């Protein structure tokens, strides 16, 4: 089974690659269209800014590849946000518009930004991503922007306000947290995705 991590040019991909390999899968990091379209599963990671990530996706013409891809895709952190309509970052960034909802800065009030550390994830809807994972398990987060509650939300987290911790639309899944940095529950989630 070919597993692909899309090289978004703005993420530390080694921890994700290592986590997938620990589960017994071969994985490649690439932006090659053919490799992506022939993969059984695709990961869309991201750390940093929506602007730089979308610039890279446009530069390598990966938007159309993702629109054509029919197998499961998992967006992680910024990768989940890239699936959305737009981000309020930098006066507005158009994104992939697969999840028809905007990404906005977290309304943190007295809570510091970025939201950095472990937080509980409450599952809203039965979903294959969370099989074998206790509700309200802790996952590792690092972000300042968030997708608020919406029709595609399958799990949520509270950090001054509730926001989407995980979303799904058809073959596209997204998680705001980093499963590859979330210990055994994170590995279980990655395993669940790889077995869909």
UniProtKB/Swiss-Prot annotation:
Record keywords, A-Z: Amino-acid biosynthesis, Cytoplasm, Glutamine amidotransferase, Histidine biosynthesis, Hydrolase, Lyase
Keyword Cell cycle appears in the UniProt entry: no
Family matches, as SUPFAM superfamilies: Class I glutamine amidotransferase-like
Active site: 77, 178, 180
Residues covered by the Glutamine amidotransferase type-1 domain: 2-196
Coiled-coil region(s): none
One Pfam match: GATase
Species annotation: Buchnera aphidicola subsp. Baizongia pistaciae (strain Bp)
Protein name: Imidazole glycerol phosphate synthase subunit HisH
Catalytic activity from the UniProt record: 5-[(5-phospho-1-deoxy-D-ribulos-1-ylimino)methylamino]-1-(5-phospho-beta-D-ribosyl)imidazole-4-carboxamide + L-glutamine = D-erythro-1-(imidazol-4-yl)glycerol 3-phosphate + 5-amino-1-(5-phospho-beta-D-ribosyl)imidazole-4-carboxamide + L-glutamate + H(+); L-glutamine + H2O = L-glutamate + NH4(+)
Subunit structure: Heterodimer of HisH and HisF.
Enzyme Commission number(s) from the entry: 4.3.2.10, 3.5.1.2
GO cellular component: cytoplasm
Pathway: Amino-acid biosynthesis; L-histidine biosynthesis; L-histidine from 5-phospho-alpha-D-ribose 1-diphosphate: step 5/9
